[in-house]
Regions:
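Helix-loop-helix junctions that connect adjacent transmembrane segments
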Residues: 6-12, 50-51, 127-144, 172-283
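Membrane-water interface regions at transmembrane-helix termini and the short interhelical loops
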Residues: 11, 70-72, 96-97, 151-177, ...
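The first (N-terminal) embedded transmembrane alpha-helix
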Residues: 17-36
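Lipid-exposed faces of alpha-helical membrane segments in multi-pass integral membrane proteins
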Residues: 25, 29, 52, 56-60, ...
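Residue-level signal for alpha-helical transmembrane segments in multi-pass membrane proteins
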Residues: 63, 67, 107, 111, ...
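Extracellular loop-to-transmembrane helix junctions
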Residues: 12, 33-139, 255-261, 265
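Short amphipathic alpha-helical coupling elements at transmembrane boundaries
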Residues: 73, 77-87, 94, 169-172, ...
């Protein structure tokens, strides 16, 4: 396939390797990285068990990345999975693939947008919890939280409409800020009086007999595809690369490794830094 674009053909090639890496990492690390350590990772696998599970999940994702890289080099155009399916299996399969992708992304966007309300509720409750509307399963919904989600969606839409160059730079700033903040949080945790290596015991969850639970580790491995979802944004933007598509594999692998590292760091901090009155992460 001819990979050259001229005039008005194709999309603008303005995404650098750093922009693409930031796009993938920013898609991988969402609200789940901050919520799941306490309600999924630690209860199921423990600190060390989570590390093992996320490492296994990262290896699985790298295998998938190898397949993506192969397809990107053969079909270096926008569309990702839809393009690959349509070209390989025909329009019927392509149509089905496009609909499933559309439904999945339609679910992810409001999921992450409304996660801002959860953050605002815990950090700035007086700013967002106004205008009570209704309750769902005992969870109150406020107009202020909905407004926060709408503002975030509009902001990102504006950056996207402005063009891929602006969106790429904005995403890069956000991703680098995210990585920097997590590492600063880790450094602060090391010097916190509430942090101790002894808090990481037990390293694994145990079953009724007191033995380490392999099932718990496998349970975390099972959610790895969800935890790492996002690096698949790279093949979808492949037509906008301003570099060789052969670099896509390295970028995908780096985004997966960074994503896995951030998950493990946040999970370890959650277990090691305990509030007053607690001596272990075990609930």
């Amino acid at each position: 396939m001819n990979d050259n674009r001229s005039g008005g053909e194709g999309l603008q090639r303005k995404l650098s390797p750093l922009n693409v890496w930031a796009l993938a990492l920013g898609s991988i690390i969402g609200w789940g990285a901050f919520v799941m350590p306490a309600n999924t990772f630690l209860p199921n696998a423990g600190p060390l068990g989570t590390l093992i599970a996320m490492a296994a999940g990262a290896i699985i994702m790298v295998v998938i990345a190898l397949n993506y890289s192969y397809m990107i080099n053969h079909f270096p155009v926008a569309g990702g999975e839809f393009t690959f399916t349509n070209a390989s299996f025909g329009p019927t399969c392509g149509f089905l693939c496009a609909w499933f992708l559309g439904l999945s992304y339609l679910a992810i966007v409001p999921l992450n947008a409304t996660a801002l309300a959860l953050i605002g509720r815990n950090l700035f409750p007086n700013l967002t919890q106004w205008g009570y509307l209704y309750s769902v399963e005992g969870y109150s919904i406020y107009a202020g939280e909905i407004l926060l989600a709408i503002i975030a969606l509009v902001l990102f839409a504006v950056f996207s409409i402005r063009g891929v160059s602006v969106a790429g730079k904005f995403q890069t700033v956000l991703a680098l800020s995210l990585v920097g903040c997590v590492f600063l949080l880790a450094i602060a945790a090391l010097f916190s009086p509430h942090a101790s290596a002894s808090h990481l015991a037990p390293a694994f969850t145990t079953d009724a007999t007191g033995k380490s639970s392999l099932g718990g580790i496998l349970a975390v491995v099972a959610v790895a595809p969800w935890a790492f979802v996002g690096f698949d944004s790279i093949p979808q933007a492949s037509e906008e690369f301003n570099f060789s598509h052969k670099k896509s594999l390295v970028i995908m692998v780096l985004s997966i490794l960074f994503g896995g590292a951030l998950y493990v760091i946040l999970n370890t901090i959650t277990a090691a830094v305990l509030p007053e009155g607690y001596t272990s992460w075990v609930p």
